[in-house]
């Protein structure tokens, strides 16, 4: 995946996707009064210990993809809001962190090996070492999915979307992430390399809740099949398929 035709070597959207992408689909609903995020505002330097099989992707490429994914998500949602006669208030901040407790959301510490959207302070936070490791072993598709899913949670908050069960919120965010990526590709803001969609599908089928987890349990995100179906429903049929209206 690339911005404006920038060609990139494709990474496999498998392997770490099982352990890593599943954890990205989290929206912090913190306890306590709203507060400013604590922690680093500028991206920290990721560990150099993580290596990718082909050794092609660098810290600079990772940081560039994070920024392109953020700008593209903002551009996509601004266009959707404008088409509805209103103006998007962009998500205030995207924060990289490295340690447990380095970032907090409404008094709740954000753990390592995670990515979240904080509703009370309006920011996305991601563990940079964990994310960079996934980027190098899974590929840049991981970054665009991660940012797309968490940005979708920010849009849900702006629209006042609320559900009785976590799984409903999460599957809708998967659909919205698919709509954002599909819309960005259709508009020419992003380009897909051959096989990227197959990698998205394989990766999404590799994530999901454990077979024994009840669908109604707090924190449920959906089965692998449900998550893949939601993402590609949004990708193929656009935002109208995501149940926002």
For the regions a language model picked out, list residue spans one by one:
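Active-site metal-coordination segments of metallo-dependent hydrolases
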Residues: 56, 60-63, 161-175
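Active-site recognition of the HExxH zinc-binding catalytic motif
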Residues: 77, 145-158, 174, 178
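Pan-zinc metallopeptidase signature
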Residues: 212-245
């Amino acid at each position: 995946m690339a911005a404006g035709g920038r060609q990139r070597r494709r990474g496999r959207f498998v392997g770490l996707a099982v352990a890593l992408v599943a954890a990205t689909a989290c929206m912090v609903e913190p306890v306590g009064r709203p507060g400013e995020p604590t922690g680093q505002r500028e991206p920290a330097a990721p560990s150099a210990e993580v290596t990718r099989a082909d050794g092609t992707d660098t810290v600079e490429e990772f940081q560039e993809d994070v920024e392109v994914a953020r700008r593209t998500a903002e551009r996509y949602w601004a266009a959707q809001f404008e088409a509805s006669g209103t103006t998007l208030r962009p998500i205030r901040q995207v924060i990289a962190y490295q340690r447990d407790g380095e970032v907090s959301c409404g008094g709740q510490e954000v753990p390592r090996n995670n990515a979240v959207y904080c509703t009370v302070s309006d920011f996305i936070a991601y563990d940079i070492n964990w994310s960079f490791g996934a980027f190098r072993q899974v590929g840049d598709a991981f970054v665009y999915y991660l940012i797309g899913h968490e940005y979708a949670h920010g849009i849900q908050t702006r629209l006042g979307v609320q559900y009785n069960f976590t799984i409903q919120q999460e599957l809708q965010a998967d659909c919205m992430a698919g709509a954002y990526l599909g819309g960005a590709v259709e508009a020419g803001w992003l380009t897909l390399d051959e096989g990227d969609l197959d990698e998205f599908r394989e990766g999404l089928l590799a994530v999901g809740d454990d077979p024994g987890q009840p669908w109604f349990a707090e924190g449920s995100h959906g089965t692998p099949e449900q998550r893949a179906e939601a993402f590609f429903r949004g990708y193929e049929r656009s935002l109208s398929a995501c149940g926002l209206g």
